[in-house]
Amino acid sequence: MIKDENWGIPLVRIRDFFSAQPDVTADGEDFYFGHCRITLTPITGHFLGPWEMPRTQIRMEGPEEDVRIIHRRFYLRFLSAGG
């Protein structure tokens, strides 16, 4: 299963979130939850009028169960405006 999403959250906040998860491991620039690989990519050049909005592409790829669990955890953490 693949989840490929674009979030209006700075890369550093997302990295901090995954780094704080006891069952998530880091491997270089990627994170792993079970057999789910999590790749974070900063997106530059997105403007909302005169303001630049931080954007991060998040790609979760792996077995359906692993992807659903970690995606739900991430989604619930950052669901509210401003996370």
Language model segments and positions:
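A short, structured beta-strand/loop element
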Residues: 32-52
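C-terminal structural segments of small proteins and small subunits
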Residues: 53-80
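Short, intrinsically disordered, mixed-charge
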Residues: 16-23, 72-83
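Broad gene-expression machinery/nucleic-acid interaction feature
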Residues: 28, 35, 55-57
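Short solvent-exposed loop/turn micro-motifs enriched in small/polar/acidic residues
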Residues: 23-25, 31, 53
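Short Lys/Arg-enriched alpha/beta "domain-start" segment
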Residues: 1-26
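Beta-strand elements of well-folded, non-transmembrane domains
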Residues: 6-9, 42-44, 62-66, 78
